[in-house]
């Protein structure tokens, strides 16, 4: 089995992901931060170390696909897309669950770069 290194910078990134999730839900006044906060280490590990993807070319044919089957935890994916350079900005996270935002309540394929499946 391959050993995965985990440095202080990784822990800080996960802590940041958790805070971003909590702040986004607090700002909009509704949503589900708990799952995004608890899945932050796993999602970070997948996006940063495991999944083959290219944020500059999110439709690259050789990419791995991440399907978030629990759509109400959309922040899990949105935060990783933000941290991973898929084109989401901090203002997009702040606009969570608002009309016309790139961060609707559930991930939507074709709406947010990096989202592979609508859940």
What kind of feature is each model-predicted range?
Residues 1, 22-23, 57, 61:
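General secondary-structure edge motif
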Residues 7, 39-119:
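Cofactor-binding active-site loop characterized by glycine-rich and histidine/acidic residues
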Residues 11-15, 32-37, 71, 119:
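Short, conserved micro-motifs enriched in small and acidic residues
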Residues 4, 32, 83:
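Short, flexible active-site loop motifs that bind/organize anionic cofactors or intermediates
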Residues 16-30:
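N-terminal capping segment at the start of a domain
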Residues 31-34, 56-58:
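Short secondary-structure boundary/capping segments within folded domains
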Residues 1-19:
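N-terminal hydrophobic or amphipathic helices/low-complexity stretches enriched
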């Amino acid at each position: 089995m391959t050993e995965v290194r985990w440095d202080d910078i990784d822990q800080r990134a996960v802590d940041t992901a958790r805070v971003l999730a909590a702040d986004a839900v607090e700002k909009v006044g509704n949503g589900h931060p708990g799952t995004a906060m608890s899945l932050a280490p796993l999602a970070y590990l997948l996006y940063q170390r495991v999944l083959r993807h290219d944020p500059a070319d999110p439709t690259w044919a050789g990419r791995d696909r991440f399907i978030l089957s629990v759509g109400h935890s959309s922040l899990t994916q949105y935060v990783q897309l933000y941290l991973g350079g898929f084109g989401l900005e901090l203002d997009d996270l702040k606009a969570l669950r608002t009309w016309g935002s790139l961060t609707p309540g559930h991930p939507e394929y074709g709406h947010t770069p990096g989202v592979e499946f609508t859940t």
